């Protein structure tokens, strides 16, 4: 008995292999199609994602008719929203135009400017906020600090060498000194104590010279009619020396030539410039700040030695400009004058001051001073400002004692300390 073995059929095996290969190919194709579908989504998927539905899982179950109807409804709703927005904008625009028409300040130029702003393309990127907010502007420049950034004003200063600045300063100081010295020389009056000492003369010659001075001043200050018309004055003229007669004749001729000056101007010395006074009077005369006349007299015509004196009227009007012993000497000379001449001089001064309503300076009871000077003296003569022996200088502008002009020979000094109990004069 032998065993029987079944051998597989060659045809059947080949068929099985072909079927398996075909199945594998189909599976691969299906997978590739799925991948292609996933990589290339359909238009439906794209629209649904754009609307905001997200990734739809049941897209295959949605039919095309339903999808198309949904899209139509969505588009219609958006169109209505746009129409409503247009209508509201038109209403607002009509209200704005109406207000602009009613407003007088709104002109065509402003309308054109608004249209230009709307038409410009570069303004489309600008978005205005609905509510105005206060924002801090950022500065483009770096922060200014004293350590890092220098000061602009210090950079604008012109730089120069030190020696140039010193030279310019010295020149300015010299110019100022020259100007002040020139002004002081013009304003300062001559000092009666700056001349060399006078040679001593006999008492009789001094009395004669003083009488000549008094008569000469009386002829210059009294009216022309009373001076040159009376016989007494003519008799007095014959008693003077020859030099005084010639001087008086020259003065009389110049006064007659310059007849425009009034009688009061001749007496008071007002409205008289330096040029005019030098033409009318001889070179010995000059005008004081009080309006009176002073004379510089030479004792002899041959030897002109400087002997500066003043009239009795000017002496009594300005008692503070002379030392005490000077008044005593002049009072002694007045007492020793001829009684007839002294009486005639006193009558002339009384009549002259009665004519102009002034006090008689010849009287020993009163000393005539201007109003402003008397007030100043009243303020200065305070019991704690000056002692009884001092002679204050009226209207002394310089506070330094070195710069003040020495008007008196003896200058007393008082050292006063003002306290709350004794305050300074006001």
Curated annotation (Swiss-Prot):
Ranges where the record places region Disordered: 1-41, 123-158, 170-208
Superkingdom of the source species: Eukaryota
Residue spans of biased composition, Polar residues class: 1-30, 176-188, 197-208
One biological process term in Gene Ontology: cell division
Name of the encoding gene: POG1
Keywords of this entry: Activator, Cell cycle, Cell division, Mitosis, Nucleus, Stress response, Transcription, Transcription regulation
UniProt keyword Transmembrane helix present: no
Assigned protein family: Belongs to the POG1 family.
One GO cellular component, as annotated: nucleus
Organism classification: Eukaryota, Fungi, Dikarya, Ascomycota, Saccharomycotina
Protein name stated in the entry: Transcriptional activator POG1
Organism the protein comes from: Vanderwaltozyma polyspora (strain ATCC 22028 / DSM 70294 / BCRC 21397 / CBS 2163 / NBRC 10782 / NRRL Y-8283 / UCD 57-17)
Extent of Low complexity compositional bias: 139-150
Function: Transcriptional activator which promotes cell cycle recovery, after pheromone induced G1 arrest. May also be involved in stress-resistance.
Subcellular compartments: Nucleus
């Amino acid at each position: 008995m032998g065993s029987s073995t079944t051998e597989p059929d060659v045809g059947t095996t080949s068929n099985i292999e072909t079927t398996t290969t075909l199945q594998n190919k189909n599976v691969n194709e299906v997978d590739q199609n799925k991948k292609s579908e996933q990589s290339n989504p359909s238009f439906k998927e794209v629209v649904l994602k754009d609307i905001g539905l997200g990734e739809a899982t049941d897209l295959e179950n949605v039919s095309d008719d339903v999808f198309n109807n949904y899209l139509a409804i969505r588009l219609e709703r958006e169109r209505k929203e746009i129409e409503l927005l247009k209508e509201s904008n038109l209403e607002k625009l009509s209200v704005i135009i109406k207000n602009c028409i009613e407003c007088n300040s709104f002109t065509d130029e402003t309308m054109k400017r608004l249209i230009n702003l709307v038409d410009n393309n570069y303004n489309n990127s600008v978005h205005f906020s609905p509510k105005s907010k206060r924002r801090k502007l950022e500065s483009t420049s770096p922060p200014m600090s004293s350590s890092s950034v220098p000061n602009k004003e210090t950079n604008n200063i012109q730089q120069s060498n030190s020696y140039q600045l010193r030279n310019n300063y010295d020149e300015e100081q010299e110019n100022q000194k020259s100007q002040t010295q020139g002004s002081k020389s013009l304003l300062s009056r001559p000092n009666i104590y700056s001349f060399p000492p006078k040679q001593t003369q006999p008492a009789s010659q001094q009395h004669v010279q003083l009488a000549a001075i008094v008569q000469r001043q009386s002829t210059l200050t009294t009216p022309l009619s009373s001076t040159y018309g009376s016989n007494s004055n003519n008799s007095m003229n014959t008693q003077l020396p020859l030099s005084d007669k010639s001087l008086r004749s020259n003065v009389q001729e110049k006064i007659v030539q310059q007849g425009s000056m009034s009688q009061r101007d001749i007496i008071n010395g007002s409205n008289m410039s330096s040029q005019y006074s030098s033409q009318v009077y001889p070179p010995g005369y000059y005008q004081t700040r009080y309006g009176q006349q002073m004379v510089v007299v030479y004792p002899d015509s041959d030897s002109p030695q400087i002997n500066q004196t003043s009239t009795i009227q000017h002496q009594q009007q300005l008692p503070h400009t002379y030392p005490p012993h000077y008044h005593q000497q002049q009072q002694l000379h007045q007492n020793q004058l001829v009684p007839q001449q002294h009486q005639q001089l006193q009558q002339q001064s009384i009549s002259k001051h009665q004519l102009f309503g002034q006090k008689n300076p010849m009287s020993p009871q009163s000393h005539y001073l201007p109003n402003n000077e008397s007030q100043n003296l009243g303020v200065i003569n305070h019991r704690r400002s000056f002692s009884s022996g001092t002679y204050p200088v009226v209207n002394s502008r310089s506070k330094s004692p070195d710069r003040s002009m020495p008007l008196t020979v003896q200058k007393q000094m008082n050292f006063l300390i003002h306290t709350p109990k004794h305050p300074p004069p006001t």
